[in-house]
Design a protein with these regions (language model features):
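Short, aromatic/basic-enriched loop-to-helix "N-cap" motif that marks the start
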Residues: 50, 76-77
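Basic, amphipathic "hinge/linker" alpha-helix immediately C-terminal to the N-terminal HTH DNA-binding motif
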Residues: 77-95
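Amphipathic alpha-helical dimerization/coiled-coil segments
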Residues: 89-113
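Beta-hairpin "wing" of winged helix-turn-helix
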Residues: 63-76, 82
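Basic amphipathic alpha-helical segments that dock to polyanions
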Residues: 53-55, 59-60
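Alpha-helical residues within the helix-turn-helix
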Residues: 39, 61-62
Length: 113
């Protein structure tokens, strides 16, 4: 049986996974490469690792939510991502859903903290 800390850690990971797409889409109005996006998210308290972010970026690019281009800076090629028109529309809808969920959760939780 898992102890309480392990259970909480697992549940926190599940919650974070569910919000990561929206978190990424909110940061993509300007071109970003993977590492700069990790830093931006971490600065806002969304802790994400490379092995989580890069597959997510590829997946949501394949869905048409992001566009990417390769650019060479110095000697290193970097893949830069930017939100697509579809991504902007999806982000807007996800934000609406987030706000509804936030309101519902606030009602459910009430003063419990």
């Amino acid at each position: 049986m898992l102890d309480m800390e392990a259970i909480i850690q697992n549940l926190q990971q599940e919650m974070n996974r569910g919000t990561l797409v929206l978190a990424v889409l909110t940061q993509m109005d300007q071109q970003q490469y993977g590492y700069s996006l990790i830093q931006a998210l971490n600065d806002e308290g969304i802790m994400v690792e490379q092995n989580t972010l890069y597959p997510l970026l590829r997946r949501i690019e394949k869905q048409g939510l992001l566009e990417s281009i390769w650019q060479v800076e110095g000697n290193r090629p970097r893949r830069y991502y930017k939100i697509s028109e579809l991504g902007i529309k999806v982000r807007k809808e996800l934000i609406k859903e987030w706000k509804l969920l936030e309101k519902s959760m606030a009602n459910l939780i009430g003063g419990e903290v």
